């Protein structure tokens, strides 16, 4: 009986020791945002991005040859100084960065098509370590062809995050995947601290101006859902978004008549496209002239850093939440940031 007791005790401590060893090699999940998190488990790197889950060998990191099928992800690479790891990109006409355009001209970055049709043959020739893209259901067949040919695709839908800082936090994920973890953490911390500081100042203002946002496409006005990062920018900037009670996490199409009624007391109209003048705005849709805010308020477009079809607010602005918030606060509460000038936005005259 005594030897059985000794064997039991010995076995218990062996199992306990093994469990402790296993736990030491398994890290808890690192939460990047509401939709993205990753974990390192033994020799595996695990990633969750909304409904998608990935597992690959840690020795595959850092990635050194990347294809981007969405320009909105470009800003993260630029912020980390990792643009030379990009070997292919789609929609080159929408690229704002001079650095990227120069790399395209030198053929160091290849044009791999557009959001209408990707150049599968070109992508396969490039043999990238990974493709980063937003998930678009209509391209499911294209994704399958690439995956069947051994190409790794990671779907990242940063535009579906609810808060600007969650969207900016993808910088930390790219830092991990590109071997720039420390730099990414430092940059993100600075962005977050600056954002929170500006937000705190704006929240203290007793004045909360009513604000209309976005514009019409076809016969509908696509408002920012009340739970989108766009709506949260306005809230954090100390504004009263007229559709704040909406509970959607994406853009919502509504009629012009609904906007007309709801925007009666709006003092500002922001995110009014890429137009530079009110005349350009009316040329797109003359019905805007009926809005009170068009006649009496101030209108701001996301047009200050625009070149051709490219706009930097969708590039660097995807990461620099602090600069975007500064623009909104400068518009709604100029007294808070008297020395600042607008970075991405500009008033339509």
Positions of predicted regions on the chain:
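A short, structured surface patch at a secondary-structure boundary
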Residues: 45, 49, 59, 64-124, ...
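Bacterial Sec-dependent N-terminal signal peptides
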Residues: 1-24, 328
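Bacterial Sec-exported substrate-binding components of ABC uptake systems
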Residues: 18-74, 182-212, 278-279, 295, ...
């Amino acid at each position: 009986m005594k030897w059985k007791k000794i064997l039991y005790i010995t076995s218990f401590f062996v199992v306990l020791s093994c469990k402790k060893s296993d736990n030491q090699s398994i890290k808890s999940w690192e939460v990047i945002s509401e939709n993205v998190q990753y974990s390192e488990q033994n020799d595996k790197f695990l990633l969750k991005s909304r409904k998608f889950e990935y597992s690959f060998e840690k020795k595959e990191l850092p990635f050194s040859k990347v294809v981007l099928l969405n320009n909105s992800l470009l800003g993260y690479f630029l912020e980390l100084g990792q643009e030379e790891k990009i070997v292919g990109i789609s929609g080159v006409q929408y690229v704002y960065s001079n650095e990227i355009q120069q790399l395209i001209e030198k053929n160091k970055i290849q044009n791999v098509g557009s959001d209408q049709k990707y150049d599968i043959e070109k992508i396969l020739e490039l043999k990238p370590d990974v493709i980063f893209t937003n998930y678009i259901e209509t391209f499911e067949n294209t994704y399958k062809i690439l995956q069947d040919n051994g190409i790794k695709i990671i779907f990242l839908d940063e535009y579906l995050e609810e808060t600007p800082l969650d969207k900016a936090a993808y910088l930390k994920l790219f830092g991990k995947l590109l071997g720039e973890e420390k730099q990414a953490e430092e940059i993100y911390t600075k962005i977050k601290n600056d954002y929170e500081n500006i937000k705190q100042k704006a929240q203290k203002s007793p004045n909360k101006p009513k604000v209309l946002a976005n514009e019409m496409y076809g016969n509908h006005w696509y408002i920012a859902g009340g739970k989108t990062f766009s709506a949260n920018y306005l809230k954090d900037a100390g504004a009263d978004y007229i559709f704040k009670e909406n509970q959607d996490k994406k853009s919502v199409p509504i009629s012009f008549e609904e906007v007309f009624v709801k925007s009666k007391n709006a003092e500002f109209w922001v995110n009014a496209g890429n137009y530079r003048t009110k005349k350009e705005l009316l040329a797109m849709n003359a019905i805007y002239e009926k809005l009170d805010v068009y006649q009496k308020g101030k209108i701001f477009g996301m047009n200050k850093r625009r070149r051709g079809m490219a706009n930097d607010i969708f590039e660097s602005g995807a990461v620099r939440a602090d600069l975007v918030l500064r623009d909104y606060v400068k518009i709604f509460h100029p007294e808070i940031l008297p020395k600042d000038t607008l970075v991405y936005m500009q008033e339509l005259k």
